[in-house]
């Protein structure tokens, strides 16, 4: 009987270890990320965007920190020195963020959008560590190859991309931070969505844990939080907590009718003025 109990305890302990984030993160990465190859002909839409916003479009290939090939789009508005660097969410690819571009270009800023490793035309495979490194590589390209001053780069994170944008802000000097539909930290989201994850203390989650809350509780660039109040994937209480505990300067804009994936086109009467005011108040 004692041997049977001991074997059962040992089996449970082994299972606990094997499915822990520290050991099984490669498996969890396949669950978290849902990249889609780039396959649509977007020529007409891009031409229309260039014409309407009087901007120049560049299709860009650059290197990730680990040498993989990354793909980006640069919409340059000659009349500005500010660039919004977009780190998108966990699914699709940047062509699925075309609806976001008018929202950002109307601010008067240039926009640089890119695909993480494994997304769109970018080679490799994604992980939480890699998306942070990819954000860093994109920032370095913008500042070193496009010759944009670091203080003129506004980092924009969408969903899981908020973690990449926030982490980037700890590695490089940035001009401002915009987090759309953020979360407090990956361990917190995991615990909220999977009861099993509540058994694991935060230290067993490998770095980076995409801890937006911890990063914003320290000194940071001007911060704008945007969140849909009907978001059923990442509830807006995450943004409220970040807002409550973050250091100044900080601003929170809640969109009453927006969910998780329609922030670009819902309640734009609130999001557009908020974006414009935030960006135009930057030095």
Predicted regions and their residues:
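An N-terminal hydrophobic leader/cap segment in hydrolases
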Residues: 9-61
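Membrane-embedded segments
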Residues: 65-141
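Short alpha-helix in the alpha/beta-hydrolase fold that links the catalytic acid
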Residues: 100, 212, 221, 235-244
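Primarily recognizes the serine-hydrolase "nucleophile elbow" in alpha/beta-hydrolase
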Residues: 138-145, 150-197
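Short beta-strand/loop motif that positions the catalytic acidic residue
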Residues: 218-220, 225-227, 231
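Acidic catalytic loop of the alpha/beta-hydrolase fold
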Residues: 230-234, 261-262
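Catalytic histidine-centered segment of alpha/beta-hydrolase-like enzymes
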Residues: 258-268
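Catalytic active-site module of serine/aspartate enzymes centered on a nucleophile-bearing elbow/loop
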Residues: 267-283
